[in-house]
């Protein structure tokens, strides 16, 4: 991604799973991000969208699962995930929109 004006083009969706939900207590959040984005762009986008201080960003490319269909085999879409650690003392991100 050469130039992105909107940080919401980089951060696509939060990952809501049992593992990612357990990591929220440690100020670690997981997001599905644009496949061409790098760690610096992800950090800037998280800080702009949620107004928090990011400590570190780890990324992982997940290969799409091979699935059987009636006519043969297909493949789910591959995704890139970002595991974002917030700085100590930073306010938590409200992913669920419920009052605390």
Swiss-Prot record:
InterPro entries listed in its UniProt record: Nucleotide-bd_a/b_plait_sf (IPR012677), Ribosomal_uL23-like (IPR013025), Ribosomal_uL23/eL15/eS24_sf (IPR012678), Ribosomal_uL23_CS (IPR001014)
Any one Pfam family match given in the protein's UniProt record, by short name: Ribosomal_L23
UniProtKB keywords: Ribonucleoprotein, Ribosomal protein, RNA-binding, rRNA-binding
UniProt-listed GO biological process terms: translation
Function: One of the early assembly proteins it binds 23S rRNA. One of the proteins that surrounds the polypeptide exit tunnel on the outside of the ribosome. Forms the main docking site for trigger factor binding to the ribosome.
Family: Belongs to the universal ribosomal protein uL23 family.
Subunit annotation: Part of the 50S ribosomal subunit. Contacts protein L29, and trigger factor when it is bound to the ribosome.
Name of the protein this chain belongs to: Large ribosomal subunit protein uL23
Organism per entry: Mycobacterium sp. (strain KMS)
Lineage: Bacteria, Bacillati, Actinomycetota, Actinomycetes, Mycobacteriales
């Amino acid at each position: 991604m050469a130039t992105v004006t909107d940080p919401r083009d980089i951060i696509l969706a939060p990952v809501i799973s049992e593992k990612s939900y357990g990591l929220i207590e440690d100020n670690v959040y997981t997001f599905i991000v644009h496949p061409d984005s790098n760690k610096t762009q992800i950090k800037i986008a998280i800080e702009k969208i949620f107004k928090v201080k990011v400590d570190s960003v780890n990324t992982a490319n997940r290969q799409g699962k091979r699935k059987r269909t009636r006519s043969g085999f297909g493949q789910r879409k591959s995704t890139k995930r970002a595991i974002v650690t917030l700085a100590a003392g930073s306010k938590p991100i409200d992913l669920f929109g419920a009052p605390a």
